[in-house]
Amino acid sequence: MTRPSDMRADVRASTVSSAYRRFWADVGEHFPDLGGAASTRYYSENERRLFAEHFPPLDGLRVFKSDLWDEAKNTRILAWASRQGARAYGIDISEPTVIEARAAFDREPLCGAVADVRELPFCDASFDAIYSMGTIEHVRDSERALRELARVLRPGGRAIVGVPNRHDPFLRPLVAAALQALGLYAYGYEKSFSRRALREMLERAGLEVVAETAILFIPGWLRMLDLACHVWCRPLAAVTGALVWPFAFLDRHLPAVRRYGYLLATVATKPERGG
């Protein structure tokens, strides 16, 4: 088991700008909790299915997550994995997010650190499984982040990497781009990827793609509206929840639609040494 004392001692001084750190610290400190919204429950259902279908049994598995936003504000997927017996590790650029994320763990404590996904403070081959959903699109040098994820994954280990789907049929990338241009997007800089582009980036990082799917078959605007109602107008959340339900129903009963979710989810493995 990797412990904090096993973290790399040779990590270079962070090149992350202070403005970037301040932005995410402010988001982590002031962003409302999204847990309990209908679309968040649907999101959580999707994530648990990914874990069940693409990771080995979680008991004793060293699972690393590339940000702790979900643990602080959203699905609490890593805390769920911990309750299934996984050994949970994660980093986030925001100290308030790391502090809040730790509170979600009630079985075993989270080994969490304030760090940049492009400069991970862990030794090579530290983890059996890596879950990175909605992280690397927020940094301009996404390939560097993927190389770091590949470095800390053990040979034979599996990674699930998720990013916004450039070809989302409900055009969420256009909505996000418009909000960014207006300075209204809560998550700062974000880019989207095609399935092919993500696959090629993973391969350049030294990983072998073994499966491609997606999660959140739902219009991005509906997810945003549902969260807004959950936070600021609970009576209307019943309405948005009813609108979420048909998409969740299709997802459960017509698996073919999952390919069109607004977050790609590509599964990759790290080749065994000498393989």
Residue ranges with predicted function:
Residues 176, 211-275:
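A C-terminal cap/extension of S-adenosyl-L-methionine-dependent methyltransferases
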Residues 2-59, 158-182, 223:
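Conserved class I S-adenosyl-L-methionine
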Residues 62-119:
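Class I SAM-dependent methyltransferase SAM/SAH-binding core
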Residues 189-206, 212:
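Short alpha-helix
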Residues 143-158:
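A short glycine-rich, Lys/Arg-flanked "PGG" loop and its adjoining helix->strand segment in the class I
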Residues 118-129:
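A short acidic, Gly/Pro-enriched loop at the edge of an enzyme's catalytic core
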Residues 38-42, 180-197:
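Acceptor-substrate binding/catalytic loop of class I
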